[in-house]
Curated annotation (Swiss-Prot):
Any single GO CC term annotated in Swiss-Prot or TrEMBL for this entry: cytosol
Region span, Disordered: 142-170, 192-288
Region (G4): 490-493
Region ranges (G1): 390-397
Protein name according to UniProt: Translation initiation factor IF-2
Pfam family membership, one: IF2_N
Keyword flag Protein biosynthesis: yes
Chief place of localization: cytoplasm
Biased composition (Low complexity): 198-207
Species of origin: Shewanella frigidimarina (strain NCIMB 400)
């Protein structure tokens, strides 16, 4: 072959020119791109590259590949087995270590072997030496014992003298102890040396082998990455790794099938079972369960909060939720696993199941907030809070008007009080705060709140009317609140006034006049003329002095919500009666489920004020929502904590309400299943104040019967909004506004959806119209009335109709269109209708009393002489509640 250039040679071998020039340079030849290359130079370069790549040296790496093919029978879905070919490929790479490394490892192994032999030899020598020393010690001990025995025998035969220690025996004993201590020290030191040598040898071997192991691991990973390998992980592939394993599997399957085909109960089968039981491996003792089922019932201390679900209660008692559900079914209550239970119900269930109950208080933050108050302030006298109670139209508000020199009763709708009015009056002898409560039966909760917040109750009884139902209820509220009661016998200016009758009737309910030796003061008054009003005020102040009413004046205020409403321009407004402390503008108030900072304060006359002391009623603005009447209002220090407490109360109120609703839903469901479908009258109710809203809801709830139920789907305080109208339209409800009106947007929705809208200002009218609507929803009642009676005198046969009864109408009137009954001996034997009614061969629509007629009964021919034909009508009767 002729010489060639470097550039052509690079193109032939498939390398770049620069790389080829670099390899020539490494081989000791300097070449450029245009230089020629001879055959000798090519061979020289080839020899260098072979040497560089190790072609001439002994190979240091060897790879072995193995491939095995086997057949495995696998059961198919059709019940037949099919053969599956399984191919297993294995690849293993061996790497030869360097000679220097092998020599070093061999040297280390030789050293370790020599060291181990030396240690073994030393150990054998030490053991031999120890055995010799032990033998010498034992011989010395035996010799000493023999000498001691001989001496003791000699002493027995000689007279008793004082013993003297043998010097030789003592010396032998000391020498034995010294040898023993020396042996123990030598043995301990030898063990320490052996442990140190073994640790050093292990460390050296680890240093040598760590590099080798790392290199082998790297080479193995490279081989797996670059080589053709197959990892078998499936159960089938592992089972088919060897053909002999597959054959064993087939033989085992045939043996199992053969055993399965044996007759049951035979001797072979029994022997096989016994052999199987003998050969069956038992689990090791360490795998046995450490838990044993309790032999007796376990009683736990169950901590229950204000509300808890059934699943949470089961977790606390370490039982299944089904046990609690069964227990509550036994107690007469149906629950689900996620139903919320109140604290009392959960306590009963836990105690029934034999556990101890610990009731926990979750409102710790609320307790801390309410406890953080000024308690070190002195008490001062305060004005009495007087509640005026009595029956409707007995003159409560008129009497208060005369005291206040104002006309409030004229402004009330219908002349009756429908709100709690709070007023304070300055008299010559001091200040008095009056609460005017409604007297109508619907306002029971209002009167109860008035009695709770009061110091003295004035019971107004009309002298011409006497004791009435709400009078008795007021007496009960006063007694329940343990409040002193003063009776004001009103309307004494009327000619038919009879105060003695009032005293007599009140005595039947435990109210005895002081004139009759009782404890109650009776004052005769007239709201028109003012008779006895001064004596009444003096009696109130006298009673307050006896009670010694005192309160904190300069501390943080606390009171009770008398009334609340949602004002369109001002937002939530609450009337609060301050009971202690001084309420100031800017205070943070926690009021039931609501909280807020007081933005403005007004008295009962609408005048702006900045603070209010004890026994002063005041209107406040700035709460987050409308509080419920009767809630306690408390001034707190931190608005953030007040918000947390209010949110906590709202969540708890929601949980308790949900628990009650679920319980009532289940009860209603079972009642409906028993009694059938119940008609519902849906109502969306809005009122001007919270107290009126509660009174209306209670009155409407009392109207519900077994057949018609009043369902108040939404209630609230404030004007009727578009949301209320939309809800009423969606639920087919009546929209009711009590002393409130609908805004413009709500009126558009009401007109477009044709919602039934009702406005009321007097509670009587509202209740009467709802009762009338419920009456219209009652299922009609039908009654059968007998309108005529005819007696059969003779029977004729007609080829077209059949039997024709010749009758005489003895009572009422017989109509052809009315249904009839055929009576024989006053027993109904047929009920149907007339087919023919004739008089003198002419069809007649009706035949009256005392006339004869021919009657053909449809589908009935067994009419006999003496039978009676009774004609009746079904009449619908209107029902009332």
């Amino acid at each position: 072959m002729a010489d060639t250039s470097v550039e052509k040679l690079a193109a032939e071998v498939g390398k770049s020119v620069d790389r080829l020039i670099e390899q020539f340079s490494q081989a000791g030849m300097n070449k450029k791109q245009l230089d020629t290359v001879s055959e000798k130079e090519k061979q020289q370069l080839l020899d260098y590259l072979k040497k560089q790549h190790g072609a001439d040296s002994v190979p240091t790496k060897m790879t072995l590949q193995r491939k095995t093919v086997s057949t495995l029978s696998v059961a198919s879905t059709g019940g037949q087995s099919k053969d599956v070919k399984v191919e297993v490929r294995k690849k293993r790479t061996f790497v030869k270590r360097d000679d220097a490394e092998l020599a070093k490892q061999a040297e280390l192994e030789t050293q370790a072997k020599a060291k181990a032999e030396a240690e073994a030899q030393a150990k054998v020598e030490a053991e031999a030496k120890a055995a010799a020393e032990a033998k010498a010690t034992a011989d010395a001990k035996k010799k000493a014992e023999a000498e001691a025995k001989l001496k003791s025998e000699k002493v027995k035969s000689e007279p008793k003298v004082t013993k003297v220690a043998d010097p030789e025996t003592a010396a032998a004993k000391v020498e034995a102890d010294r040898l023993k201590a020396t042996q123990e020290a030598v043995l301990t030191q030898k063990q320490k040396d052996e442990a140190a040598k073994a640790a050093e040898t292990a460390r050296q071997l680890a240093e040598v082998n760590s590099k080798r192991w790392a290199e082998e691991e790297r080479q193995r990973l490279d081989a797996e990455k670059n080589g053709d390998h197959h990892i078998t992980t499936s159960k089938v592939a592992r089972a088919a790794e060897d053909s002999s394993d597959a054959d064993d599997e087939k033989r085992g399957r045939r043996a199992r099938n053969k055993n399965a085909n044996k007759k049951r109960g035979g001797k072979d089968a029994r022997d096989g079972r016994e052999k199987h039981m003998r050969n069956r491996s038992t689990a090791p003792e360490s795998m046995a369960h450490g838990f044993n089922k309790p032999a007796a019932a376990v009683s736990r201390d169950v901590r229950i909060g204000e509300t808890v679900t059934v699943s949470e209660l089961a977790h606390l008692m370490a039982i299944k939720a089904t046990v609690i559900i069964k227990q509550m079914m036994k107690m007469g209550t149906m629950v689900t696993i996620n139903q919320v239970l109140d604290q009392e119900t959960a306590q009963m269930v836990a105690e029934e199941l034999g556990h101890k109950v610990v009731l926990i208080r979750e409102n710790e933050l609320e307790h801390q907030v309410l406890k953080d108050r000024d308690d070190n302030i002195q008490l001062e006298s305060r004005a009495p809070v007087v509640t005026i109670m009595g029956h409707v139209d007995h003159g409560k508000t008129s009497l208060l008007d005369y005291i206040r020199r104002a006309k409030v009763a004229a402004g009330e709708a219908g002349g009756i009080t429908q709100h709690i009015g709070a007023y304070h009056v300055e008299t010559e002898n001091g200040m008095i705060t009056f609460l005017d409560t409604p007297g109508h039966a619907a306002f029971t909760s209002m009167r109860a709140r008035g009695a709770k917040a009061t110091d003295i109750v004035i019971l107004v009884v009309a002298a011409d009317d006497g004791v009435m139902p709400q009078t008795i209820e007021a007496i009960q509220h006063a007694k329940a609140g343990n409040v002193p009661l003063i009776v004001a016998v009103n309307k004494m200016d009327k000619p038919d006034a009879d105060p003695e009758r009032v005293k007599s009737e009140l005595s039947q309910h435990g109210i005895m006049s002081d004139d009759w030796g009782g404890d109650n003061m009776f004052v005769h008054v007239s709201a028109k003329t003012g008779m006895g009003v001064d004596e009444l005020l003096e009696g109130i102040l006298l009673q307050s002095e006896v009670l010694e009413l005192k309160a904190v004046r300069d501390g943080m205020a606390a009171g009770v919500v008398i009334e609340s409403q949602l004002d369109k321009g001002r937002g939530p407004v609450a009337t609060i009666l301050v009971q202690e402390g001084t309420l100031r503008q800017g205070d943070i108030v926690l009021c039931g489920l609501e909280y807020g900072k007081i933005r403005a304060m007004k008295d009962e006359n609408g005048h702006a004020i900045t603070e209010a002391g004890p026994s002063i009623p005041v209107e406040i603005l700035g709460l987050s929502g409308v509080p419920s009447a009767g809630d306690e209002a408390t001034v707190v220090r931190d608005e953030r904590k007040a918000r947390e407490v209010a949110l906590y109360r709202q969540g708890k109120f929601r949980d308790v309400k949900l628990a009650r609703q679920q319980k009532s839903k289940l009860e209603n469901m079972f009642a409906n299943m028993e009694e059938g479908e119940v008609q519902e009258l849906n109502i969306v109710l809005k009122a001007d104040v919270q107290g009126s809203l509660e009174a209306i809801c209670e009155s409407l709830a009392k109207l519900s019967t077994d057949e018609v139920k009043v369902n108040i789907i939404a209630r609230g305080v404030g004007a009727l909004t578009e949301t209320d109208a939309t809800l009423a339209a969606a639920s087919n409800a009546i929209l009711v506004g009590f002393n409130v009106r609908a805004d413009a947007q709500a009126r558009k929705t009401i007109d477009s959806e044709s919602v039934d809208l009702r406005y009321y200002s007097i509670i009587y009218n509202l209740i009467d119209e709802v009762r009338a609507a419920m009456t219209g929803m009652l299922a009609p009642e039908f009654r059968q009335e007998i309108i005529g009676l005819a007696e059969v005198r003779d029977v004729f046969k007609s080829p077209k109709i059949g039997a024709i009864a010749g009758c005489m109408v003895t009572e009422g009137i017989v109509k052809r269109s009315a249904p009839i009954r055929v009576l024989r001996d006053n027993v109904v034997i047929f009920e149907g209708e007339l087919e023919s009614l004739r008089r003198f061969k002419d069809d007649a629509p009706e035949v009256r009393n005392g006339m004869e007629c021919g009657i053909g009964v449809k589908n009935y021919n067994d009419v006999r002489v003496g039978d009676q034909i009774e004609v009746f009508e079904t009449v619908e009767i209107a029902r009332t509640l």
